[in-house]
Amino acid sequence: LYPQYTLLKQNSAYFVALKTDDIHVQRGLYFPWKKGISERLVISNLEQFTSSLKSNDIPVMKNLVINYDKVTSVAIAGNSGSGKSYTLTYLLSVLKNISDLIIVDPKFDTPSRWAKQNQIAVIHPKENRSKSDFVSEINESLSQCLFIIHKRQGILFENPHHEFKHLTIVIDEVLALSEGVNKNIKDSFFSLLSQIALLGRATKVHLLLVSQRFDHNT
């Protein structure tokens, strides 16, 4: 079938029932696939490309599009120099048209420069403040996001069909952010992240986290 179709990997065999009374052929194997193969996007003008996108679709590769309405959270992982910042810049450029953004940039690097160019506020370290103060500032912002979630839940209780604008919390180097920080502040930080990840889906509040690794220890 390759390259006309791309088979989607499954964890185990996928059986389907067939419309027949013959017990020998009442079942069949189902192979999910999509037409074509995914190829890298080549974008000559990012601003023009993002403005031409329809609805809440985010192209990841050719023949591979993600609907942001169906996304809970996004994680970008990779070693240094693997292109995490490049990918993040692309996603930010797409998301700015469909979502409100809260950007946290511990390295005061690429996301901060992008935010400045697009006139979006960014939380970054300051010379006269400790790392614990910096994470405390982030916790305040996350608490406000959690308040928004609870407020939106109340609106949904009265009107289940109410549509909210997406709100995306972007945190670069999320694991390195908590190293060397007061334990109470660190625990509060991860607790807020967990609550937002758990409750944010129905209220269209998302996390976009970037780190060198994500595993069961993190």
Report each predicted region and the residues it spans.
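Short basic/glycine-enriched coil/helix segment immediately N-terminal to the Walker B
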Residues: E158-L167
